[in-house]
Amino acid sequence: MAELTHLDERGQARMVDVAEKPETHRVAVARGRVSLRPETLQLVREGRAAKGDVLAVARVAGIMAAKRTAELIPLCHPLPLTKVEVDVRTNEQDTCLEIEARVETVSRTGVEMEALTAVAVAALTVYDMLKAVDRGMTIDRIQLIEKAGGRSGTWRREDDEARHAR
């Protein structure tokens, strides 16, 4: 198992020193979903939610969240993001909204947390916008799908869970 880099020799939490690492192009993709009732999904699809365009607002919320990750996750480095894409789409078969975020930077550390935060906040935004009509919504399957760049290279999730999260 890999060493926990956010702990010092005494086991105390610390922000990792990345000063000596080279700047490289980094990419991370994360996914998640919000399961809801069929009639709630229909409201979203038809643009009839009382609070407005759920898909557009969730997209923007995810982008904003990626940019503010270091303010939310205590040991994350503030990063100069070069690209953030958040896609929110309806899935009629599974009665859910699927969320995917792709985040890029040229930096000394990865953007996995930014991608995961984008998905989580987009999902929470969906819940906030629709809770008046469907308090039973479920947010789940928030996971890293892929990361590239840096010393550890490329990693991709290859299990069934990732395929089902699409």
Curated annotation (Swiss-Prot):
Keyword GTP-binding among UniProt keywords: no
Functional summary from the UniProt entry: Catalyzes the conversion of (8S)-3',8-cyclo-7,8-dihydroguanosine 5'-triphosphate to cyclic pyranopterin monophosphate (cPMP).
Pathway terms, separated by semicolons: Cofactor biosynthesis; molybdopterin biosynthesis
Molecular function GO terms recorded: cyclic pyranopterin monophosphate synthase activity
Organism expressing this protein natively: Thermomicrobium roseum (strain ATCC 27502 / DSM 5159 / P-2)
NCBIfam families hit by this protein: moaC (TIGR00581), PRK09364.1 (NF006870)
Membership in a protein family: Belongs to the MoaC family.
Active site: 128
A matching Pfam family: MoaC
Organism phylogeny: Bacteria, Pseudomonadati, Thermomicrobiota, Thermomicrobia, Thermomicrobiales
Assembly, per entry: Homohexamer; trimer of dimers.
Residues involved in substrate binding: 75-77, 113-114
Name of the featured protein: Cyclic pyranopterin monophosphate synthase
Catalyzed reaction equations: (8S)-3',8-cyclo-7,8-dihydroguanosine 5'-triphosphate = cyclic pyranopterin phosphate + diphosphate
EC number: 4.6.1.17
Biological-process GO terms, alphabetical: Mo-molybdopterin cofactor biosynthetic process
